[in-house]
Design a protein with these regions (language model features):
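Short, structured segments at the rim of ligand-binding sites
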Residues: 1-196
Length: 196
């Protein structure tokens, strides 16, 4: 997936000086822009079948622009705390803030501290270590939304394992369904939608 290529692409450059990511399927036609990594010592090339990242990722200051996608930022937020020095990520026109909130929340749960200056700058201390190594992965609101909408149109469904306090933006499907007249029953981490 695009997320995997972007996040793992960044992560792998912290371990290896030369990384080649082979792409197939829909990834062949997608744009992948790793050019912001040049600020941290990594150059980027791509052709139809591969993304090539040359150079080992260094700590430092990096500028992320809107074209880079929030997924590159996610990769940097996950990777930079483990490098030897401190880093600063400067962002312009950040997209997909809920996904960044999810990343920051997960890292915080694991004991990784990152200072968020209103999504314009992230200050990352280097040499951090995980305080925990177990995570409970919450249900995916994006995937659940399709089924919840289908039930609102044609019947009923109950989906378990959805975190009602989730930072996932697609959790908003509940308010949309309510406005559309669907009957909702919410109990613990269980959501039932009934056609009304």
């Amino acid at each position: 997936s695009g997320l995997s290529l972007r996040v793992f692409g960044v992560l792998l450059t912290s371990f290896f000086e030369n990384v080649t990511l082979n792409r197939s399927g829909s990834a062949i036609n997608r744009k992948f822009d790793f050019s912001s990594l040049k600020d941290l010592g990594v150059t980027f090339y791509e052709n139809e079948s591969s993304i090539i990242l040359d150079g080992k990722l260094n700590a430092g200051t990096v500028n992320i622009n809107k074209l880079d996608s929030s997924q590159i930022l996610t990769g940097l937020l996950i990777t930079l705390p483990f490098l030897n020095d401190n880093s600063i990520i400067k962002c312009k026109d950040l997209v997909s803030k809920p996904y960044i909130d999810i990343t920051l929340s997960l890292l915080d749960d694991l004991g990784i501290q990152i200072k968020n200056n209103n999504y314009k700058e992230f200050v990352v201390e280097g040499n951090q270590e995980l305080k925990r190594n177990k995570v409970i992965v919450e249900g995916d609101w994006s995937s659940a939304a399709f089924h919840l909408v289908g039930a609102a149109i044609s019947g009923s469904i109950t989906i378990n394992g959805l975190n009602l306090k989730s930072l996932q933006g697609d959790k908003e499907i509940l308010s949309v369904l309510k406005k559309c007249g669907a009957e909702l029953k919410i109990k613990n981490n269980s959501v039932t939608v009934i056609k009304n």
